[in-house]
Amino acid sequence: MPHEELPSLQRPRYGSIVDDERLSAEEMDERRRQNIAYEYLCHLEEAKRWMEVCLVEELPPTTELEEGLRNGVYLAKLAKFFAPKMVSEKKIYDVEQTRYKKSGLHFRHTDNTVQWLRAMESIGLPKIFYPETTDVYDRKNIPRMIYCIHALSLYLFKLGIAPQIQDLLGKVDFTEEEISNMRKELEKYGIQMPSFSKIGGILANELSVDEAALHAAVIAINEAVEKGIAEQTVVTLRNPNAVLTLVDDNLAPEYQKELWDAKKKKEENARLKNSCISEEERDAYEELLTQAEIQGNINKVNRQAAVDHINAVIPEGDPENTLLALKKPEAQLPAVYPFAAAMYQNELFNLQKQNTMNYLAHEELLIAVEMLSAVALLNQALESNDLVSVQNQLRSPAIGLNNLDKAYVERYANTLLSVKLEVLSQGQDNLSWNEIQNCIDMVNAQIQEENDRVVAVGYINEAIDEGNPLRTLETLLLPTANISDVDPAHAQHYQDVLYHAKSQKLGDSESVSKVLWLDEIQQAVDDANVDKDRAKQWVTLVVDVNQCLEGKKSSDILSVLKSSTSNANDIIPECADKYYDALVKAKELKSERVSSDGSWLKLNLHKKYDYYYNTDSKESSWVTPESCLYKESWLTGKEIEDIIEEVTVGYIRENIWSASEELLLRFQATSSGPILREEFEARKSFLHEQEENVVKIQAFWKGYKQRKEYMHRRQTFIDNTDSIVKIQSWFRMATARKSYLSRLQYFRDHNNEIVKIQSLLRANKARDDYKTLVGSENPPLTVIRKFVYLLDQSDLDFQEELEVARLREEVVTKIRANQQLEKDLNLMDIKIGLLVKNRITLEDVISHSKKLNKKKGGEMEILNNTDNQGIKSLSKERRKTLETYQQLFYLLQTNPLYLAKLIFQMPQNKSTKFMDTVIFTLYNYASNQREEYLLLKLFKTALEEEIKSKVDQVQDIVTGNPTVIKMVVSFNRGARGQNTLRQLLAPVVKEIIDDKSLIINTNPVEVYKAWVNQLETQTGEASKLPYDVTTEQALTYPEVKNKLEASIENLRRVTDKVLNSIISSLDLLPYGLRYIAKVLKNSIHEKFPDATEDELLKIVGNLLYYRYMNPAIVAPDGFDIIDMTAGGQINSDQRRNLGSVAKVLQHAASNKLFEGENEHLSSMNNYLSETYQEFRKYFKEACNVPEPEEKFNMDKYTDLVTVSKPVIYISIEEIISTHSLLLEHQDAIAPEKNDLLSELLGSLGEVPTVESFLGEGAVDPNDPNKANTLSQLSKTEISLVLTSKYDIEDGEAIDSRSLMIKTKKLIIDVIRNQPGNTLTEILETPATAQQEVDHATDMVSRAMIDSRTPEEMKHSQSMIEDAQLPLEQKKRKIQRNLRTLEQTGHVSSENKYQDILNEIAKDIRNQRIYRKLRKAELAKLQQTLNALNKKAAFYEEQINYYDTYIKTCLDNLKRKNTRRSIKLDGKGEPKGAKRAKPVKYTAAKLHEKGVLLDIDDLQTNQFKNVTFDIIATEDVGIFDVRSKFLGVEMEKVQLNIQDLLQMQYEGVAVMKMFDKVKVNVNLLIYLLNKKFYGK
């Protein structure tokens, strides 16, 4: 290592800033910076050493580590170590760092860091520790990354995945130069050093269920460890609040010792650290063991105990016990498989024997079990003949095979299949690792041999092309070619035959390859060898026969011919003399014709090759010899064969009849036939007469022979019993093997068909089971067990739940932000309008503009910083208050009657604000199915209440402005219904606006005036027509009529388009709006049963069209139906066109005809009637919707079975406001004392203030702007996890529904691990040890999942405790619960508790529906969020537009010196500027000007005694007004010109000053402008 550890703990290199020596402030600061640099170097060294242990790889030196980690390669390798399923080596970019070393960082290196972050997310490390990608890649905050690595090490230690990181502070030494360089680096980037010592505490808080309970439990454990009593320590470890798993009472002494050592070591390190850390920076967990450290040490002890147990059971030789020991989760070993138990036992036993200590350490077991499990899976795949699985297992790095080339995996698999069959036939079950490795090596050798052979084939083809026989022979004799039977003496003939074969292949147009392959070369060599043998045979025949003839050895001719001819059977011995005579005669004739004779014989083979043989020298050749003279006196082979054949044929023909001489004699003897027939008949008659005796004789004889033969056979068997048994066993084995291989081959040949059949059968079985689950009234337990896994909450479920919660929060926040932004923009619009009237208010406009641009921030920080005193602090009192508020809002949310009554108790203006803020917030703006369902229930209850109490006649709904209807329309036209309105109306509205030629004006007077103006424009002369006319007069002009008719035609055409868009888009209408329309129709009909359907449908139309759609058509820009740019607007013609269409549709929806002043439009009345009929069908169909319970699949028990608890995001101001209103109207909405609401309000007490809600200290008491700060903080939003106080109680007071839920969860846990046909059978049958182990493993897996589960999704504490029970205890608890439920009538033992099984089946079905609805909700929320973002972007564009306008005003103002300059800091004119003089008026003068109207209790003639001094203050637009009576100053008030302008805008004409002086607001503003601004 680059830095040596010091022998013992000592102070850091640069000591503490509180050393005894006297240091100046600068020296102390320098010392502190040096200490920070040293500590950080120690943390770097700690991270480096820990990563080296995990990666088994050396990292760069400590001082270079930061730079070495920037490319993310080591981080990605670390991710592969703890999350191998997430990160593989192939996914790591530049894994060998060759590119990085060559050309430095590349942007793709960030992929490595991203993979590391995702891997940490997958194992559940809290995100509070994560660095940003740029922190690493751009080196913006490397200490943050090192901080994260430390947190990760502690978290992995808790999970038992990695060792604990070392504490090296004060144990390593760095040079002064290294420390100074690091200090400069830290100062260069200005990085705030994270607090490494607080990682344990932060991690504990982030992962806890209840921070306070966890903290207390951890402290109790530390205290118990300090006392040293092992039994007491185990009791504290068992505390459920500590959230510790796998605590074994039998290991109490080991836990005590390990935790004692760890705690003492941590305390020792803490003492060193605290010497250089200020008191404020110290953390409680610096000396205490954190929950993660405790769990890590428990895991460490458990692991060692499990390893000891494994080593103890291996020598016993029981595979089942060994398997159980290996499967224990405490052993932290890879998965093992029961079918390979014998293999684990044998292999581990052998490994243990090979070990010198006869003991296998955990690391050895880890590697061995991983490899053996991989081998087991490979054997399983081989047995199932699954080639794909075999190949996947071979590719697995866990199996650890050497020299495995992934390119040949398929070949390895096929070979292993063959070897597997062979070992199976020999009675061996599994292939061992060594056998698999040997098979891999064998295949590699074969592949290498084949590759070498391919090279040799290439050499042979090249030699053939060269035409050199010796070169060809040399290549044929290469060992790698493996060509057999090559005779070097016939090299030339090999060359000729090979060349000929290759020429033929070249000439074959269908041949793909133009070279000879190995089998073709071997065939050519074999053909050449056949030619060679034939030639030798021919030479032997010719030489032997001719030499025999020349030697006149007639007696040898037969032996010569038989030994020399190809078929000796054709030689007939009787013809020997004839053969000799014929051959001698032929040779003599041939010799007479020869004058000179040579010594060479020639043979032509296949009419292609010539073979030469010298009879004298015995040499042979495949090429023509030099000076070749043929031996023409000798008979050739063909001549000899022809002579032999001729002699043989003649002999056969000559003797054909002699062979049948005896037969001919017999035929001659048949002349005595009659005599023979008489003898035959006599014999036959005798036998017939003696038939009975003959039969007996024959039977006796046959029996005798059969018995004799049987006894002889039997004796043979007895004498050879051993041999017979062997023969029989081998025969049976061969038969069975043949049958098995035949069947196996059949399966291989029909693999695809078999897979399809199996898939079909499985699918049919699964389909039938699911139909049974869904359709059967009493689904059997066996079916339920198959689908119970669907109730598990996967990581995907949690991710989707978190995503839904995040989107809900974002949607709610965005809606509120947009609403506030819209209000501020409207106010800004007003202020700019007022600015035009009075320039002095520009400062206020600028101030409001800054408010628009100011981003919200700081509130949550203040809230979080007051955790010790605020509503979310850890004190018991605050916790109780928070829980009570959560229960209060849950009650309000789920019981709509309270809010329905409260709405009608408040004044109209106050209830509207309450609805727009608190109610919609309480229901999260219906951002999910549950809250939409509950909000609709509120709307329904409130609407029914309003109709019941406030509607006296049917038309009141139309003519009035019902509160609930207004609320429903406002909600559905907001964020949730905005997309609907856009989809429904945007296309046709945009078409109308974009049609520049479209002019719709149905006002005859306006049409007339436009026509007159057009005439004057065209002629340039004043028209003689009157300008002011009535409607009747205007209609007398044909031109006006024509234009009016054209407008009416355009109106009808355009209205049709809008109507069709509305009618065809019924499904786009929000379900909530349609349901309220249905409730409205039914409620009106219930109160007014005599109302006709037309009246009811008109009321529905008033809601759906007039209130919901009509405003959006008239003002599409105001309802965000179309996109408008800032500064852009709809012109008057476009707005008139839209208004005309809306007017026609409004008349049609209410079936109102054009009459009276609209008589000129009466031609459209038929059109209105037809349109009404279409609207009537539309309104009727719109009310045809299911009830919310059916639509959303909700009931009153839904909250008890859903995964996540409901969460709302509400401001402190809204909580206080709601609390206040509930107390104010408590007597009206909850008159009973024992009402649930009254009980909760009683628990809360008085309404808290904002400051008490946040906690004392949230705001500085001396802050002059304390009121404004508190007002701003009151808008801080907090999240409330809603819970019901009355759903689940502790102990025995649990209600039957909650008991049913708990019992179902316990039953699900039991039936997973214990088989059985009925619930009763399972509960009465004891669980086996294996089932207990499987159950414990499942519960550990669930605990790990629960540890990553967000707070709002966790189960109750009682359910967590139940889940930790062993299998048998769970069964006993189920039996107790079932007896309780049977007493309440929920279940019955007579049907074996089928009722609770039916409930579980229902939960399974509902879970699928819930997942489907959740996906739909995700899409819906995303769509809503996109629309809100677009709207926010539009508002931002308006803000920019206003900013530009204000900037222009400022620029203009600077150029005008005649007016008073305005300072943006609010201080008025610069120093030295002349201030306006005070203005003094008597009351009589002001009364004369009309400014002053009256003074209470003072007569007009006394006005002269009253004077008013108006003085401009330092602040722009602020005036002091002093009143004097008879020269004595009475009172003083302050006037704000902005307030006056606001009152003027709101239409307030008269205001009071001094509570008694009435003044005219408009004239007062005029006076101030004139006197102070020169206006």
Curated annotation (Swiss-Prot):
<dbReference type="GO" id="GO:0071933">
    <property type="term" value="F:Arp2/3 complex binding"/>
</dbReference>
<dbReference type="GO" id="GO:0034314">
    <property type="term" value="P:Arp2/3 complex-mediated actin nucleation"/>
</dbReference>
<feature type="domain" description="IQ 2">
    <location>
        <begin position="720"/>
        <end position="749"/>
    </location>
</feature>
<feature type="modified residue" description="Phosphothreonine">
    <location>
        <position position="881"/>
    </location>
</feature>
<feature type="modified residue" description="Phosphoserine">
    <location>
        <position position="1279"/>
    </location>
</feature>
<dbReference type="GO" id="GO:0009986">
    <property type="term" value="C:cell surface"/>
</dbReference>
<dbReference type="GO" id="GO:0005886">
    <property type="term" value="C:plasma membrane"/>
</dbReference>
<dbReference type="InterPro" id="IPR001936">
    <property type="entry name" value="RasGAP_dom"/>
</dbReference>
<dbReference type="InterPro" id="IPR000048">
    <property type="entry name" value="IQ_motif_EF-hand-BS"/>
</dbReference>
<feature type="modified residue" description="Phosphothreonine">
    <location>
        <position position="1002"/>
    </location>
</feature>
<dbReference type="InterPro" id="IPR023152">
    <property type="entry name" value="RasGAP_CS"/>
</dbReference>
<dbReference type="GO" id="GO:0030175">
    <property type="term" value="C:filopodium"/>
</dbReference>
<dbReference type="GO" id="GO:0070062">
    <property type="term" value="C:extracellular exosome"/>
</dbReference>
<keyword id="KW-0677">Repeat</keyword>
<feature type="modified residue" description="Phosphoserine">
    <location>
        <position position="16"/>
    </location>
</feature>
<feature type="modified residue" description="Phosphoserine">
    <location>
        <position position="1358"/>
    </location>
</feature>
<dbReference type="GO" id="GO:0051015">
    <property type="term" value="F:actin filament binding"/>
</dbReference>
<dbReference type="GO" id="GO:0005829">
    <property type="term" value="C:cytosol"/>
</dbReference>
<dbReference type="InterPro" id="IPR000593">
    <property type="entry name" value="RasGAP_C"/>
</dbReference>
<dbReference type="GO" id="GO:0007165">
    <property type="term" value="P:signal transduction"/>
</dbReference>
<dbReference type="GO" id="GO:0031267">
    <property type="term" value="F:small GTPase binding"/>
</dbReference>
<feature type="modified residue" description="Phosphoserine">
    <location>
        <position position="685"/>
    </location>
</feature>
<dbReference type="GO" id="GO:0005516">
    <property type="term" value="F:calmodulin binding"/>
</dbReference>
<dbReference type="GO" id="GO:0005938">
    <property type="term" value="C:cell cortex"/>
</dbReference>
<protein>
    <recommendedName>
        <fullName>Ras GTPase-activating-like protein IQGAP2</fullName>
    </recommendedName>
</protein>
<dbReference type="GO" id="GO:0003779">
    <property type="term" value="F:actin binding"/>
</dbReference>
<dbReference type="GO" id="GO:0005737">
    <property type="term" value="C:cytoplasm"/>
</dbReference>
<dbReference type="InterPro" id="IPR008936">
    <property type="entry name" value="Rho_GTPase_activation_prot"/>
</dbReference>
<keyword id="KW-0597">Phosphoprotein</keyword>
<dbReference type="GO" id="GO:0030027">
    <property type="term" value="C:lamellipodium"/>
</dbReference>
<dbReference type="GO" id="GO:0030667">
    <property type="term" value="C:secretory granule membrane"/>
</dbReference>
<dbReference type="Pfam" id="PF00616">
    <property type="entry name" value="RasGAP"/>
</dbReference>
<dbReference type="GO" id="GO:0005902">
    <property type="term" value="C:microvillus"/>
</dbReference>
<feature type="modified residue" description="Phosphothreonine">
    <location>
        <position position="1269"/>
    </location>
</feature>
<feature type="domain" description="IQ 3">
    <location>
        <begin position="750"/>
        <end position="779"/>
    </location>
</feature>
<dbReference type="GO" id="GO:0005095">
    <property type="term" value="F:GTPase inhibitor activity"/>
</dbReference>
<feature type="modified residue" description="Phosphoserine">
    <location>
        <position position="1271"/>
    </location>
</feature>
<dbReference type="Pfam" id="PF00612">
    <property type="entry name" value="IQ"/>
</dbReference>
<feature type="modified residue" description="Phosphoserine">
    <location>
        <position position="595"/>
    </location>
</feature>
<dbReference type="InterPro" id="IPR001202">
    <property type="entry name" value="WW_dom"/>
</dbReference>
<dbReference type="Pfam" id="PF00307">
    <property type="entry name" value="CH"/>
</dbReference>
<feature type="modified residue" description="Phosphoserine">
    <location>
        <position position="1461"/>
    </location>
</feature>
